[in-house]
């Protein structure tokens, strides 16, 4: 299992997502995510289909509500990122043991996958939506004053399953 977090967010906030084109063209506005997905597709060819099916799924639910979109986005994005960077497989290739490993991971993610606070996925830099290097798929859920001390002492932190 990979120790470092070596992925980028795939899908932006609801307001941005609903205005984007469907297909791989969506990534044109997110150069870091585009580069990440293309790099993954070199070793996992079905990753492109994973991305497109997930995008279509999110698009179909984005019209219901922002909260529904955010909840679904968080869960499916975590699955895609885990499948591609930890299991090194397309979601299409996952079997029961893989899913059991994923569920274990979600309940105790690698520390590199856990941020110390909820962060925006992207930042506008030079007019482009660039990856926020502080974003992680999971966020610590501890008191602010205890967070720095726990991390500086090398302790793990409780993760939040709440959307961000």
What are these model-predicted stretches?
Residues 1-77, 81, 90, 101-104, ...:
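Basic/aromatic DNA-contact patch characteristic of tyrosine site-specific recombinases
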Residues 53-67, 77-164:
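N-terminal core-binding DNA-recognition domain of tyrosine recombinases/integrases
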